[in-house]
């Protein structure tokens, strides 16, 4: 059994958690939604300042809620890539300081690996291999999971991530921030057949459609044109129908590709991770498509879909057990492929005592 204090500050949530293997002992999140709402999106400098204000209190609360002290913590884990560098630096600096002061091992964790591990928190008995559809504001990928640090990328978006498309379309429709949850609520009241929107196919040189990759920039442009036309012809924008039609297009595109990858590569389990995993339309489409195939679906609870430190701690527990350790010169990186996470650890894994 290993107990990890984990820190997550990759974007606009200041989070800390204490995780014991795959059990959450505390999971504290300080949201910055109110700070960014006036700007209609995340402002990096505002996010960094908020992290700086919140980080000490969040860590203290996580330790307190777990009912333990520093002597019970085996290692300190922190999201170090990818993300907003200014935000990441707050968490990385805090983690390195705590590791030095309390003489604990340090583990840098890839943010996307954390989202993969949210599925283990949802289903502690889950074992690889499985396929994960990771859909968030910054990333949309189909990833084969074969073990800790062992991943294969099958597909991704070539431009806007699904969550990014949601936020941009919500802004076009005047729904405010954060756009994804607001658009989802409107979509539940609308007619998904009201408007015919493009699915976002990627054409290959031979004219065929890429089975797993997608593009959402064209869908966003189509909605922008439609909104402009409707504002000329309608006294009021049909927000619910627009939201429902857009959500259907995104959910169909993601479902089609995830199911194809699962079937083609023999996966029996499909896990969903990232903030868009909370979307009602995506959940409905995936459930309807997976059930006839006998494909097991894993949706983390809503509190584990968005950014949190518990998922980071869960990933760190496996890396710790494997003997991975990060050097104290660990730094924040705005970009790092999930396939390159070995760069976060020392050249030789340590023996686990």
From Swiss-Prot:
InterPro entries: ATPase_NBD, Gcp-like_dom, KAE1/TsaD, Peptidase_M22_CS, TsaD. Fe cation binds at residues 111, 115, 307. GO terms for cellular component: cytoplasm. Gene3D superfamilies: 3.30.420.40. GO terms for biological process: tRNA threonylcarbamoyladenosine modification. GO terms for molecular function: iron ion binding; N(6)-L-threonylcarbamoyladenine synthase activity. It catalyses: L-threonylcarbamoyladenylate + adenosine(37) in tRNA = N(6)-L-threonylcarbamoyladenosine(37) in tRNA + AMP + H(+). Keywords: Acyltransferase, Cytoplasm, Iron, Metal-binding, Transferase, tRNA processing. The keyword Methyltransferase does not apply. Belongs to the KAE1 / TsaD family. Required for the formation of a threonylcarbamoyl group on adenosine at position 37 (t(6)A37) in tRNAs that read codons beginning with adenine. Is involved in the transfer of the threonylcarbamoyl moiety of threonylcarbamoyl-AMP (TC-AMP) to the N6 group of A37, together with TsaE and TsaB. TsaD likely plays a direct catalytic role in this reaction. NCBIfam families: gcp_kae1, T6A_TsaD_YgjD. This is tRNA N6-adenosine threonylcarbamoyltransferase. The lineage of its organism: Bacteria, Bacillati, Cyanobacteriota, Cyanophyceae, Acaryochloridales. The gene is tsaD.
């Amino acid at each position: 059994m290993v107990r990890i204090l984990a820190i997550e500050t990759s974007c606009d949530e200041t989070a800390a958690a204490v995780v014991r293997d795959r059990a959450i002992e505390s999971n504290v999140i300080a949201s910055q939604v109110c700070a960014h709402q006036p700007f209609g999106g995340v402002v990096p400098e505002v996010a960094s300042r908020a992290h700086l204000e919140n980080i000490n209190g969040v860590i203290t609360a996580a330790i307190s809620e777990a009912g333990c002290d520093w002597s019970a913590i085996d290692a300190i884990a922190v999201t170090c890539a990818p993300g907003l560098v200014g935000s990441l630096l707050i968490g990385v600096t805090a983690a390195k300081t705590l590791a030095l002061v309390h003489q604990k091992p340090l583990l840098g964790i890839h943010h996307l690996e954390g989202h993969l591990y949210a599925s283990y928190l949802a289903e502690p008995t889950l074992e690889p291999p499985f396929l994960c559809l990771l859909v968030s504001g910054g990333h949309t990928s189909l990833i084969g999971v074969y073990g800790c640090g062992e991943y294969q990328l099958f597909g991704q978006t070539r431009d806007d991530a699904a969550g990014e498309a949601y936020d941009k379309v919500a802004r076009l429709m005047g729904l405010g921030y954060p756009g994804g949850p607001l658009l989802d609520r409107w979509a539940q009241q609308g007619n998904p057949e009201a408007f015919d929107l493009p699915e976002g196919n990627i054409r290959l040189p031979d004219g065929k459609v890429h089975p797993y990759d997608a593009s959402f920039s064209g869908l966003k442009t189509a909605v922008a044109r439609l909104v402009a036309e409707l504002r000329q012809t309608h006294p009021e924008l049909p927000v619910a129908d627009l939201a429902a039609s857009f959500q259907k297009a995104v959910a169909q595109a993601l479902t089609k590709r995830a199911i194809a990858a699962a079937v083609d590569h023999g996966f029996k389990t499909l896990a969903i991770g990232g903030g868009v995993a909370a979307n009602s339309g995506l959940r409905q489409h995936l459930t309807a498509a997976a059930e006839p195939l006998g494909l097991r679906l894993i949706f983390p609870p809503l509190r584990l879909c968005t950014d949190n430190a518990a998922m980071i701690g869960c990933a760190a527990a496996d890396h710790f057990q494997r003997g991975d350790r990060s050097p104290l010169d660990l730094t924040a990186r705005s970009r790092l492929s999930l396939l390159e996470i070995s760069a976060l650890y020392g050249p030789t894994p340590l023996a686990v005592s």
